[in-house]
Curated annotation (Swiss-Prot):
Residue intervals passing through the bilayer: none
Compositional bias ranges of the Low complexity kind: 79-99
Keywords: Conidiation, Differentiation, Sporulation
This protein's name: Conidiation-specific protein 8
GO BP annotation list: conidium formation; sporulation resulting in formation of a cellular spore
Stretch list, region Disordered: 1-66, 79-162
Length: 176
């Protein structure tokens, strides 16, 4: 083909031919899912073009939320969000190919794996002081503590209700 500029670039189903120039990209950016498809208008037109139904509208809503969150919080965009975006684009391209859309499919090689470093194990070592205070909370078996507990139990009023009696029997270990 001839790239002399005589022919305008061909736009995809969700991309305008010439993107608008925006002064403030946060407040003036058009939503990517509102592009009309085949003469239909409304916010679900793009979802209907992807195959319609609840699945299309859910994916368009989630893409809207993800796109708006990256505009509002640009510092959050990092390696994890890029990996999520590439996984999301790969999953949406596979669903569009099932519905017969003319949108090009992405290959599986476009999904990049982000290597995570060795994570510290949560079950072994490193938490030496985590359970140290439990030994201090243990019931003491010295005679003074046992006598004090016994006198406090005797001074308590007799339980009135069925559940209170059942609880006391359970705690004491006696059968009803």
């Amino acid at each position: 083909m001839d790239d002399t500029g005589s022919n305008p670039p061909i736009a995809g189903p969700f991309q305008p031919a010439h993107p608008p120039t925006l002064d403030n990209p946060i407040t003036e950016a058009p939503a990517p899912h509102t592009t009309p498809v085949a003469g239909k208008t409304g916010p679900d037109a793009a979802a209907q073009g992807m195959g319609g139904g609840a699945r299309g509208s859910i994916s368009s809503e989630s893409s809207k939320l993800i796109d708006e969150s990256t505009k509002l919080f640009p510092n959050v965009a990092g390696a994890a969000s890029e990996a999520f975006r590439s996984e999301r684009s790969a999953s949406t391209s596979s669903t569009t190919s099932e519905t017969g859309s003319d949108r090009p499919m992405g290959s599986a090689s476009t999904v990049t794996e982000v290597p995570y470093g060795r994570r510290p194990s949560h079950g072994h070592g490193g938490h030496h002081g985590l359970f140290e205070g439990l030994m201090d909370q243990k019931r003491r078996n010295d005679p003074a503590s046992v006598a004090r507990r016994q006198s406090l139990n005797e001074q308590r009023p007799v339980p009135q209700g069925f559940i209170a009696k059942m609880w006391d029997n359970w705690v004491r270990g006696t059968t009803p």
